[in-house]
Each structure stands twice: as structure tokens, then as C-alpha cells.
Amino acid sequence: MPARRLEKICLICCRGGSKTIKNKNIKNFLGKPLIQRSLENILKSKIFDRVILSTDSKKIANNAKKFKIEIPGLRPKNLSTSTSHQFDTHKFIFKKLNINDKNSIVCVYNNNPFIKSNLIKKSYKLFKKNKFKGLVVDASKVDGDYIASKQYKLEKKIFYLHRNKFLKLSLNRQT
């Protein structure tokens, strides 16, 4: 039996219940819903074998369906609060879809419309070159208590998580 090819997987966690801007992930930003901008750039990068959206919102899921990505049902409410940790959502999705850590897994924050496909490509190349176990891509400058401020910054605008630090550093609010 031939060895199974490892997959390149992109996971986007997209919560419906934003405390600051109601329905922010489906609000228009420069003419397009926020989630659409992220999905277009992820797909334009042509890196991933699978793009998976984890959400608790029917509206977000319906908005994303036209992109023919995987939406494995709505995630449980306990993984969708403002204090839920993304790492718990990742574990839930990986278990549900039988994804193991031998695959290349990249998490892209959906609520930043400035993540362009070239940044995703550049990030992925560095990710593979350095043999990191996980990657989080975000295009914002990090100051203060922003979600990505708990990740290591190795290069401007590109954030990596080492496997031995992932649990500790991934304890942040859902986006």
C-alpha cells in the first residue's frame, strides 16, 4: 500500500458573536464581506489541498459556501465564546476531520483583510524551510493585547508557533 501523501491544510476560525462589531466577519469592507477577502487570498495563493472554515454562524457558513471550501458543520457554542481558546477549536476540528499533526497545518486569521496571497505564500515557504510545526499568518503590527501578541514574531508580519509552545501561546480569544 503506497504511503498517504501529507496534506497542506489551512484552517480559519470565524466566530459569529463579535463583542465589538456585530457580524463583523460578514460586514462589507471596501465592497466585500471581511471573510470573503480572506478566503479569496487564501485560495489565490494556491498552496493548500484543503481549506477548512470553523464557525458557529449559519450566516458566515452560507457566505463562505460559494468558495467550495470545507465547512464541517457548525462548531459547538462552548468553543465559540469570547473567552474560548483557538487551540481547543483546532483540536475539535482536527479530531472531527481525522487530521493528524503530520500534515502541514496553517491557521490564517480571518478578520484581517490585509493578508494578501503573496504574504501567505512567503509565510508558507518559510514555514516549510524552517520545519515549523505550526504557522499563524497575520498582517497587523502587534502591540498590546492583540490576539497575535502572544505568538513569537520571527519576521515582520509573519508569526510562527513552535509545537512545544503551541498550547501555551494559543490561549487567545476566538476571531
Question: Could you describe each region identified by the protein language model?
Answer:
Residues 2-22:
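N-terminal nucleotide-binding beta1-loop-alpha1 segment
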Residues 8-9, 49, 70, 103, ...:
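Conserved acidic residues
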Residues 34-50:
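A short, N-terminal amphipathic alpha-helix
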Residues 36, 51-55, 137-139:
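Short internal beta-strands
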